[in-house]
Amino acid sequence: MPLEVTWPFPQCPRLGWRISSRVVMGMVGSYSYLWTKYFNSLMVHNQDVLLNLVDERPQDTPLITVCNHQSCMDDPHIWGVLKFRQLWNLNKMRWTPTASDICFTREFHSSFFSRGKCVPVVRGDGVYQKGMDFLLERLNQGEWIHIFPEGRVNMSGEFMRIKWGIGRLIAECSLHPIILPMWHIGMNDVLPNETPYIPRVGQRITVLVGKPFTVRHLVNALRAENTNPTEMRKTVTDYIQDEFRSLKAQAEALHHRLQNHT
């Protein structure tokens, strides 16, 4: 299924593009910062781990953050956990794969979301498509990518098997990314998955930042064994899923404790 709009990213972005992208990222980030921290109650556990990785990791070390998907505005709301100055630093902020059938259906929408470092991914087109290739290039430049590995908003709250796209990005990356799992609770109270889609105030949000890890040892072993690409993606994805799953119960316990104390 082809993308409904022209590919939004220029090969060599001009000054006007970079300035407009910085404005979009900064303004949306500022909204998220104010809305989650001041109009709602935000509790972040192990926040310094994320902040330090955004600021201080080596230039040749990509970062992949993964978290659960509760609401259609988890991104950008989740980035209320960052420092205000980070939200305005275009070079440090994340790229994220974004459903093309939602955010890239018109040229105006495409222009806005692409300047917000959202990359169109066509559902059903698999792990080999232009958006995924673009994200892989960003990783190879040492940049930060945020992924909702469930692939869609999870309204049931049950743990879903994560998609293989993340496995491809890691398996084919020429560098060795740091992977940071996170789990949040309460975003679907801030923006419920029902009409009217208007963000609410006075809600409690818990964000648990997990322990960073790499799969360098696993990828090197799979390459040494000449593992075929499909099996390699699956093995890497399964490993990440195990690390990711362990956060769910911890985050729920922290969130319930917060509710009981208020």
From Swiss-Prot:
Subcellular location(s) per record: Mitochondrion outer membrane; Mitochondrion inner membrane
Intramembrane bits: 19-35
Mitochondrial intermembrane topological intervals: 1-18, 36-262
Region (Mitochondrial targeting sequence) residue spans: 82-92, 155-190
Keywords from the named record: Acyltransferase, Lipid metabolism, Membrane, Mitochondrion, Mitochondrion inner membrane, Mitochondrion outer membrane, Transferase
Catalytic activity field: a 1-acyl-sn-glycero-3-phosphate + a 1,2-diacyl-sn-glycero-3-phospho-(1'-sn-glycerol) = 1-acyl-sn-glycero-3-phospho-(1'-sn-glycerol) + a 1,2-diacyl-sn-glycero-3-phosphate; 1-hexadecanoyl-2-(9Z,12Z-octadecadienoyl)-sn-glycero-3-phospho-(1'-sn-glycerol) + 1-(9Z-octadecenoyl)-sn-glycero-3-phosphate = 1-(9Z)-octadecenoyl-2-(9Z,12Z)-octadecadienoyl-sn-glycero-3-phosphate + 1-hexadecanoyl-sn-glycero-3-phospho-(1'-sn-glycerol); 1'-[1,2-diacyl-sn-glycero-3-phospho],3'-[1-acyl-sn-glycero-3-phospho]-glycerol + a 1,2-diacyl-sn-glycero-3-phosphocholine = a cardiolipin + a 1-acyl-sn-glycero-3-phosphocholine; 1-hexadecanoyl-2-(9Z,12Z-octadecadienoyl)-sn-glycero-3-phosphocholine + 1-hexadecanoyl-sn-glycero-3-phosphocholine = 2-(9Z,12Z-octadecadienoyl)-sn-glycero-3-phosphocholine + 1,2-dihexadecanoyl-sn-glycero-3-phosphocholine
EC number: 2.3.1.-
Placement of sequence motif HXXXXD motif: 69-74
InterPro entries for this protein: Plipid/glycerol_acylTrfase, Tafazzin
Annotated GO MF terms: 1-acylglycerophosphocholine O-acyltransferase activity
Pathway named in the protein's UniProt entry: Phospholipid metabolism
CDD domains found in the cross-reference section: LPLAT_AGPAT-like (cd07989)
GO CC, alphabetical: mitochondrial inner membrane; mitochondrial membrane; mitochondrial outer membrane; mitochondrion
GO biological process: cardiolipin acyl-chain remodeling; heart development; heart looping; inner mitochondrial membrane organization; positive regulation of heart contraction
Tissue expression pattern: At 10 hours post-fertilization (hpf), expressed ubiquitously, including in cardiac progenitor regions, with strongest expression in the head area. By 24 hpf, highly expressed in the head, eyes, and tail. By 30 hpf, expression is restricted to the head, heart, eyes, and the region next to the yolk corresponding to endodermal tissue. At 51 hpf, expression is restricted to the heart.
Domain notes for this protein: The HXXXXD motif is essential for acyltransferase activity.
Other facts noted in the record for this chain: The enzyme was named after a masochistic character Tafazzi, once popular on Italian television, apparently due to the difficulty encountered for its identification and characterization.
Protein family per UniProt: Belongs to the taffazin family.
Protein name: Tafazzin
